[in-house]
């Protein structure tokens, strides 16, 4: 009976460690996805500012 209890505790411990590792990996992947999304938004922001600046420059050149 003691052997079964120790075995059960060992299995539960290994399962919890495995679950913890999986959760950590999942959290890291989620953070990477969020970082990539933020970088993409930042790039889009810069591109729109550049396009707006070019448009303003070209309209100024055409008027001048």
Swiss-Prot record:
UniProt function note: Antimicrobial peptide against both Gram-positive and Gram-negative bacteria.
UniProt protein name: Phylloxin-S1
Keywords of the record: Amidation, Amphibian defense peptide, Antibiotic, Antimicrobial, Cleavage on pair of basic residues, Immunity, Innate immunity, Secreted, Signal
Propeptide: 23-44
One GO CC term, this protein: extracellular region
Compartments, record wording: Secreted
Record's signal peptide: 1-22
Encoding gene (name): PLX-S
Signal listed as a keyword: yes
Family: Belongs to the frog skin active peptide (FSAP) family. Phylloxin subfamily.
Modification Glutamine amide, positions: 63
Tissue and organ expression note: Expressed by the skin glands.
Keyword Secreted listed: yes
One biological process term in Gene Ontology: defense response to bacterium
């Amino acid at each position: 009976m003691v052997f079964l209890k120790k075995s059960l505790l060992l299995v539960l411990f290994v399962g919890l460690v495995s679950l913890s590792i999986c959760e950590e990996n999942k959290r890291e992947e989620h953070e990477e996805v969020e970082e990539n999304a933020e970088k993409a938004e930042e790039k889009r922001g810069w591109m729109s500012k550049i396009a707006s600046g070019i448009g303003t420059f070209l309209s100024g050149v055409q008027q001048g």
